[in-house]
A protein has these predicted regions:
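Sec-dependent signal peptide recognition
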Residues: 5-13
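Pepsin/retropepsin-fold aspartyl endopeptidases
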Residues: 2-5, 17-169
């Protein structure tokens, strides 16, 4: 019970973006055999409640991201966005909402985001201070959201700690 209460404090951050206006969807590429492959993940946080995956942004990484089906778009921690010099998406408005309130968020462009053999280009992401999320793991650098995940059939094999991405039908 105590672990659940600790995790509940992170929910406003992990599920921050439930609404965001963005211009164009990302272009997604999967390998020709339509299977984007198996990716190892690790569980972290109280009771293993967070699933962490290795992400490559603009050819750099890997960076540890939380797989977050509650996030409409992918989010990058502010220090990483600055380090990678991710360009701000002018003319687009990001609206974030969570248990803690609502407000505007900064949106940036990601040229390429790769998870295993699956890659998206032209992805929009928000920039957040993920300090609270780093309670799960000190290396968390972002949240992998639905603007990437929705393009795939996602299978989680908890027995082997494998995430399987397949091109959506």
């Amino acid at each position: 019970m105590c672990h659940l209460l600790k995790l509940a404090r992170l929910v406003p951050t992990l599920s921050l973006l439930i609404g965001c206006q963005v211009a164009a969807p990302a272009r997604v590429q999967a390998p020709p055999d339509s299977a984007a492959g198996e990716i190892s993940f690790r569980l972290a946080g109280p009771g293993g409640a967070a699933l962490l995956v290795p992400i490559y942004l603009n050819g750099e990484g890997p960076f540890e991201f939380v797989l977050d089906t509650g996030a409409t778009i992918t989010c990058v921690d502010q220090p990483l966005a600055e380090r990678l010099n991710l360009p701000e998406q002018r003319g687009q408005i990001g609206l974030g909402a969570g248990v803690g309130g609502a407000g505007r968020v900064r949106l940036v462009g990601i040229d390429s985001l790769r998870l295993g053999a699956a890659e998206a280009s032209g992805l929009t992401a928000c920039v957040l201070d993920l300090q609270q999320v780093r309670a799960i793991s000190p290396d968390v650098a972002g949240l992998l959201g639905l603007n990437f995940l929705k393009e795939f059939r996602v299978t989680l094999d908890f027995e082997r700690n494998i995430l399987l991405l397949q091109e959506a039908d």
